[in-house]
Amino acid sequence: MKEYRLNMLSRADMVKGQGVLSAYEEELRLISGRLDRIHGDSGDFKLNISINDKIDGDITHIHTVNPEFFLRLPAIKSKGIAVGSVHFLPETVDQSLHLPSVARQAFYSYLISFYKSMDRLVTVNPCFIPKLAAYGIDPQKISFIPNYVSGSVFSTVDRQQVKELRSSWGLDPERFTVVCAGQLQTRKGVLEFAQIAKALPQMQFVWAGDFAFGGMICLERLITMTKK
């Protein structure tokens, strides 16, 4: 049986509590120990996984757009295939970045160049495919693979446990509860979430998330809104 090596490149752990990191970690958990025998068109094969290895693999999956990975691309592509994850586009992070106009445009140009340099792209959002195509990227080399979470970590609990969990967080155990998880950013819909909460005071609304990337402005708007 043939063996190949999959090298996973990521610096998502540089900032804790954000979606790219959790998506990367969940993917690692999903594939770990499950690639020993893969059925291919030309026979079975095995994928050995390495993480942030300096030696490039037959397949190198780049999860974050760090310049150090971009500079390695010629060597990566000379040995194998470069696969890039598309977690965001210029228009989806525009409200989250607080950069001068020139720096902002330079980053956006770099981001699209990064994506264009990949042999294959994987996006977590199917709506990104036509948008990437509008940037001049061949949609045939883009695959949609949604994010996923571990069923053993996120699972249903019985009614008594629900009450206990709510009480432990200072919530009314009996009220209808709405929960949203995400970074505290305008693009995540936190202001709309707050507006709905004000309109439905009979329910309790909980937002689980931090402001790792420029969320302070959003927080200021949220505080202003709640005072009105």
Q: Residue spans of the language-model regions?
A:
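N-terminal subdomain of nucleotide-sugar transferases
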Residues: 1-49, 198
